[in-house]
């Protein structure tokens, strides 16, 4: 299912990258422009910047409406017109360099299939390899001997291989992992120029994953199993002497202990281990594979989860000398703790150039209650996304914030160039101001939250109409990077204050908050959201008579729960793709032992469907017809029953909308328009 390449002929002003950097003004006298629905729903104008391994080329994805093209420049001559690579049959999702002269491109398109006699509407993705001009296209493993039967071969036609290692020191090969519904995963050494593939590891039916070193040799394997204590995940390392797989760690999923290899780049007999065993948050450790013991703690953050490593060559498994940072889940998502002063100096220099002030941010350890303060930039983060050394050191940088639409910069030598404003038409003054806060739950637990307050110059003084906006998951979390879904920018620019509570059950804020949500769906988890609404009113940030709840996925479940709980806090609710029957949604996953053992004790509590005919407030429900994560029936059942209540119910099915991704910008805009109109005119008839 390869696309027909379409090498674009028309270029826009956005493809000329030598743009002047305009310093931010303390006060802009121009009138504040409220972003339109179409501007909020648009794809980023230009995004996905990356550098070739040798730093000589740079690529990005440019969007014009629903059309997305790959642009490729010579880094030393950005003023020249880039090569433009497009696709006719599928839509480009992402692109990156595999080698100096070859790209990996992911594509997507709607797909209808009959599975088990029923029509399934979904999306399919494809991984393709092409050259820098987009002349030749290959589908990795298309001809590899990976199918066990003709039936399995048909199923595997829908599978999406993934690049496991780019092997930066090999000019031709990468490691690709096959992935299909009808077979286990295998690892292949794939030649990006010839398309030839050779299997390097056949994984067994209980093998979950594998890691390879810089030469492409499998060195670690993750295996699942069941013993007397329950379902476990074991980490195995290949014995250099015997070639056998030796088990080093075993953790039980019901305990939610994490013991995993974060990097193989520490040396031949050393790995970097990530573990939260006996800890509030995960940390990184140096582990001696021969002595089978932890040698030292490499990195820990007292308030955030450590994640992994970064290095110079853009591939994790190179060597210890290339490590430049440890990563952690910070306020803006994945952030870096730099090991070399030069990178921190670059970031501070960029922030000064952009007039980003430093502020003091209080932090609280939810588990212990201990407090501290850190310095951070006000309203945005600056992150180095790529670096290449050489005669002219070259950096790619990203600047982003919840009220600061993402921007991309190139620092080459001493020259700083603005590459792209992802949403150039959005006036960020209309988006208000965001900050990270804590509030107390009724049982005393500290609840982290992100608060976005409308701009008084646009909306006047508070208290404001407010929306409590819980994230999905629930084992997930929010961050303060720009919200490309458009939800928070839409609400804030329409003068609604937004609270994003990191309620109990949220992940990556530490073990205490994560596990406090067990078996508390619609109960203490919901109390946390309600306590956030009460806090907004007590702080005189929100008008207590003008508070609504809006969420998607698990957040949609929370909106259903808000509608049926008799507390009188909310004027109305909006549920996007919400779960209404937790027993039915749980039954879909119960046959998976890992999901069952890990989440069975946690997915218990209120099932809103049981009380849908007694909803207490007006509600709008919307759901995509291609959603294969939360089936459409979850909304249909709730709406059918809720219409028997005395409250107004709106219901909308969005065509070609999955569990989040919209196939066209028109559909994306339709979703945002529904939210805007409901809060302006619905919500019981008079708006919020």
Feature names for model-found ranges:
Residues 328, 400, 469-473, 553, ...:
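Glycine-rich His-Gly loop
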Residues 12-22:
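Bacterial N-terminal signal peptides
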Residues 402-437:
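An N-terminal hydrophobic leader/cap segment in hydrolases
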Residues 397-398, 402, 441-447, 525, ...:
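C-terminal substrate/ligand-recognition segments
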Residues 13, 26-381, 386-395, 402-403:
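Beta-propeller folds
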Residues 500-688:
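Active-site-proximal cap/loop segments of hydrolase catalytic domains
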Residues 423-545, 552-553, 585-588:
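Cap/lid segment of the alpha/beta-hydrolase catalytic domain
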Residues 2-14:
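Bacterial N-terminal signal peptides that target proteins for export
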């Amino acid at each position: 299912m390869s696309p027909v390449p379409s090498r674009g002929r028309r270029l826009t002003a956005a493809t000329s990258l030598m743009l002047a950097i305009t310093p931010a003004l303390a006060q802009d006298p121009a009138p504040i422009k409220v972003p339109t629905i179409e501007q909020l729903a648009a794809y980023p104008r230009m995004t996905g910047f990356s550098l070739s391994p040798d730093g000589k080329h740079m690529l990005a994805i440019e969007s014009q409406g629903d059309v997305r093209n790959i642009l490729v420049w010579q880094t030393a001559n950005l003023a020249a017109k880039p090569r433009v690579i497009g696709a006719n049959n599928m839509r480009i999702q992402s692109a990156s360099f595999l080698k100096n002269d070859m790209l990996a491109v992911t594509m997507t398109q709607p797909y209808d299939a009959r599975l088990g006699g029923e029509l399934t509407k979904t999306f399919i993705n494809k991984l393709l390899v092409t050259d820098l001009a987009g002349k030749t296209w290959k589908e990795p493993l298309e001809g590899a001997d990976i199918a066990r039967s003709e039936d399995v071969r048909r199923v595997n036609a829908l599978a999406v291989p993934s690049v496991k290692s780019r092997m930066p020191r090999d000019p031709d090969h990468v490691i690709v992992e096959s992935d299909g519904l009808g077979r286990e995963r295998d690892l292949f050494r794939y030649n990006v120029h010839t398309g030839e593939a050779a299997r390097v590891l056949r994984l067994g039916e209980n093998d979950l994953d594998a890691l390879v070193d810089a030469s492409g040799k499998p060195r670690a394997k993750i295996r699942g199993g069941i013993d007397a204590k329950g379902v476990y995940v074991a980490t195995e390392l290949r014995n250099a002497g015997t070639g056998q797989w030796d088990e080093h760690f075993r953790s039980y999923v019901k305990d939610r202990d994490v013991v995993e290899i974060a990097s193989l780049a520490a040396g031949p007999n050393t790995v970097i281990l990530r573990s939260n065993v006996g800890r509030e948050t995960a940390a990184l450790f140096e582990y001696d594979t021969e002595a089978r013991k932890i040698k030292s703690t490499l990195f820990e953050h007292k308030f955030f989860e450590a994640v992994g490593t970064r290095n110079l060559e853009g591939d994790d498994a190179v060597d210890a000398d290339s490590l430049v940072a440890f990563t952690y889940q910070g306020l803006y998502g994945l952030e870096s703790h730099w090991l070399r002063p030069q990178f921190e100096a670059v970031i501070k220099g960029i922030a000064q150039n952009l007039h980003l002030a430093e502020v003091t941010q209080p932090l609280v350890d939810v588990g212990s209650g201990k407090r501290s303060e850190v310095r951070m930039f006000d309203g945005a983060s600056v992150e180095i996304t790529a670096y290449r050394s050489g005669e002219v050191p070259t950096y790619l940088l990203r600047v982003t914030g919840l009220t600061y639409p993402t921007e991309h910069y190139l620092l080459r030598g001493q020259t700083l160039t603005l590459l792209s404003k992802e949403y150039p038409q959005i006036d960020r003054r209309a988006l208000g101001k965001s900050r990270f806060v804590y509030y107390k739950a009724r049982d005393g637990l500290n609840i982290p939250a992100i608060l976005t307050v409308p701009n008084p110059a646009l909306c006047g003084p508070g208290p404001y109409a407010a929306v409590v906006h819980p994230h999905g998951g629930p084992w997930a979390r929010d961050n303060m990077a720009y919200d490309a879904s458009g939800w928070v920018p839409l609400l804030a620019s329409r003068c609604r204050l937004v609270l994003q509570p990191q309620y109990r059950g949220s992940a990556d804020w530490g073990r205490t908050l994560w596990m406090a949500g067990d078996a508390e769906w619609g109960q203490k988890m919901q109390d946390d959201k309600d306590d956030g609404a009460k806090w907004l009113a007590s702080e005189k940030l929100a008008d207590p008579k003008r508070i609504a709840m809006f969420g998607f996925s698990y957040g949609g479940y929370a909106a259903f729960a808000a509608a049926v709980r008799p507390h009188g806090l909310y004027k109305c609710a909006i549920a996007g793709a919400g779960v209404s029957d937790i027993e039915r949604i749980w039954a879909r996953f119960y046959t998976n032992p890992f999901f069952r053992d890990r989440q069975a004790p946690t997915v218990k509590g209120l099932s809103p469907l049981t009380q849908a005919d007694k909803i207490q407030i007006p509600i709008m429900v919307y759901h995509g017809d291609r959603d294969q994560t939360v089936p459409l029936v979850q909304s249909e059942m709730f709406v059918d029953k809720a219409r028997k209540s005395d409250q107004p119910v709106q219901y909308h099915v969005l065509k070609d909308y999955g569990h989040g991704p919209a196939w066209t910008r028109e559909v994306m805009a339709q979703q945002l328009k529904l939210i805007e109109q409901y809060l302006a005119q619905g919500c019981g008839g008079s708006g919020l």
